[in-house]
Amino acid sequence: MPSSALLCCLIFLARVAAGQHQGTQAKDSCIHFPDSLPHMLRELRAAFSNVKTFFQMNDQLDNSLLSQSLLEDFKGYLGCQALSEMIQFYLEEVMPKAEDHGPNIKEHVNSLGEKLKTLRLRLRRCHRFLPCENKSKAVEQVKSVFNKLQEKGVYKAMREFDIF
């Protein structure tokens, strides 16, 4: 066997072995996902506490953005999908607008966003443990109300982040 062919075979086998090792690592981290979730949620709450007062003081609306039906979706078979959609909603629609309230707020909102991204990544990586298939009507309702509130929606959504 020519040395270049042997080298190619060795490289191929090394990649296969590395891929299997990475797959095992991802699988192992997913096994521990339920145990690490409370810690991740505590980190999110701690990050949110840095901006909570600001957004609560600036939310002048009496209505609630997050509804009982969303809570029911979180608890039901749509739980993972509703959570995934809400994370995407906050990362793509709420937080970019929330960052526009000064450099100090932006720093804390960015930190909160990074923790949400980490949670979203873990949810995606461990999707076998949490089926995410159907769209949540409650999340669609939240998005609709948020858009109707226009610039006041960001205060409402950020104020209610801890409910989410």
Curated annotation (Swiss-Prot):
User: Which InterPro entries would you find in this protein's record?
Assistant: 4_helix_cytokine-like_core, IL-10, IL-10/19/20/24/26, IL-10_CS
Q: State where the protein is found.
A: Secreted
Q: Which UniProt key words apply to this protein?
A: Cytokine, Disulfide bond, Glycoprotein, Secreted, Signal
Q: Which GO terms describe its biological process?
A: immune response; regulation of cytokine production
**Annotated signal peptide:** 1-18
Q: Which GO terms describe its cellular component?
A: extracellular space
UniProt keyword annotation of Flavoprotein present: no
Annotated GO molecular function terms are: cytokine activity
Looking at the record's lineage, which domain of life comes first?
Eukaryota
Principal localization reads secreted
PROSITE patterns reported in the protein's UniProt record: INTERLEUKIN_10
Q: Which residues are glycosylated?
A: 134
Q: Which cysteines link up through disulfide bonds?
A: 30-126, 80-132
Q: How does it assemble?
A: Homodimer. Interacts with IL10RA and IL10RB.
Family according to the record: Belongs to the IL-10 family.
Instruction: Describe its function.
Output: Major immune regulatory cytokine that acts on many cells of the immune system where it has profound anti-inflammatory functions, limiting excessive tissue disruption caused by inflammation. Mechanistically, IL10 binds to its heterotetrameric receptor comprising IL10RA and IL10RB leading to JAK1 and STAT2-mediated phosphorylation of STAT3. In turn, STAT3 translocates to the nucleus where it drives expression of anti-inflammatory mediators.
What protein name applies here?
Interleukin-10
**Organism of provenance:** Orcinus orca (Killer whale)
